[in-house]
Swiss-Prot record:
It is found in: Endoplasmic reticulum membrane. Zn(2+) 3 binds at residues 100, 105, 123, 126. Zn(2+) 4 binds at residues 115, 118, 132, 134. A zinc finger (AN1-type) spans 4-52, 94-142. The UIM domains specifically bind 'Lys-48'-linked ubiquitin polymers. The UIM domains mediate interaction with polyubiquitinated proteins. Keywords: Endoplasmic reticulum, Lipoprotein, Membrane, Metal-binding, Methylation, Phosphoprotein, Prenylation, Repeat, Zinc, Zinc-finger. SUPFAM superfamilies: AN1-like Zinc finger (SSF118310). This is AN1-type zinc finger protein 2B. One of its GO terms (cellular component) is membrane. The gene is ZFAND2B. Plays a role in protein homeostasis by regulating both the translocation and the ubiquitin-mediated proteasomal degradation of nascent proteins at the endoplasmic reticulum. It is involved in the regulation of signal-mediated translocation of proteins into the endoplasmic reticulum. It also plays a role in the ubiquitin-mediated proteasomal degradation of proteins for which signal-mediated translocation to the endoplasmic reticulum has failed. It comes from Homo sapiens. The modification Cysteine methyl ester is found at residue 254. The lineage of its organism: Eukaryota, Metazoa, Chordata, Craniata, Vertebrata. Residues 155-171 have a biased composition (Polar residues).
Length: 257
């Protein structure tokens, strides 16, 4: 006697047996008999969801817990950086000693990355003020502005000390008069920041630097070197001309029979 209303048929296409005590697959939620309830027996397509494996640290052979959906490589890497007790991991931990001070971040870096506003240490991902919610006040001077200010300080220090070329008497020849360039005194560095923004101060410093690099009047030593070079060139040309004349005036020893 059959009871078609009792139990359920096996979902395996090759079986379809009526089982009074059917079993439900916890992966694909299919109904199967006792012979096909295993994942491998009915070729379950959702068996990978139940195949949970715990990765093992390759250095200390300790199982590393991994949250669902998290890549195991990331969990193993964080374990090596923080909790691994092996010698290579501890040696690496001594190198990466600069811990990020942002809340919730455990990244460590080899060098310090200090914020210019709050003077705190952060990792590469959180080094910008917007990435770590910087609480520092004020707008810091950029590196270009600092470089321009340092150049202006160097120009101001060198312009106050008289150079040896200014103290020496000018050697002017009667046929050639040299003009002395007017002395230029750089304004103090404080004037760069007095009432000027950072961009204006940078532009002012660049103009001062370009003014310092203008070509100067040649010195006496340069004029003497130039005259000596011209004299040597003229003597060489005269010697070659005399040699050419002597060769042309020399009689030929060849005779025709």
């Amino acid at each position: 006697m059959e009871f078609p209303d009792l139990g359920a048929h096996c979902s395996e296409p090759s079986c379809q047996r009526l089982d009074f005590l059917p079993l439900k697959c916890d992966a694909c939620s299919g109904i199967f008999c006792a012979d096909h309830v295993a994942y491998a027996q009915h070729h379950c397509g959702s068996a990978y969801q139940k195949d949970i494996q715990v990765p093992v640290c390759p250095l200390c052979n300790v199982p590393v817990p991994v949250a669902r959906g998290e890549p195991p490589d990331r969990a193993v890497g964080e374990h090596i950086d923080r909790d691994c007790r092996s010698d290579p991991a501890q040696q690496k931990r001594k190198i990466f000693t600069n811990k990020c001070e942002r809340a919730g971040c455990r990244q460590r870096e080899m060098m310090k990355l200090t914020c210019e506003r709050c003077s705190r240490n952060f990792c590469i991902k959180h080094r910008h003020p917007l990435d770590h919610d910087c609480s520092g006040e004020g707008h810091p001077t950029s590196r270009a502005g600092l470089a321009a200010i340092s150049r202006a300080q160097a120009v101001a220090s060198t312009s106050t000390v008289p150079s040896p070329s200014q103290t020496m008497p000018s050697c002017t020849s009667p046929s050639r008069a040299t003009t002395r360039s007017p002395s230029w005194t750089a304004p103090p560095v404080i004037a760069l920041q007095n009432g000027l923004s950072e961009d204006e101060a940078l532009q002012r410093a660049l103009e001062m630097s370009l003014a310092e690099t203008k070509p100067q009047v040649p010195s006496c030593q340069e004029e003497e070197d130039l005259a000596l070079a011209q004299a040597l060139s003229a003597s060489e040309a005269e010697y070659q001309r005399q040699q050419a004349q002597s060769r042309s005036s020399k009689p030929s020893n060849c005779s025709l029979c």
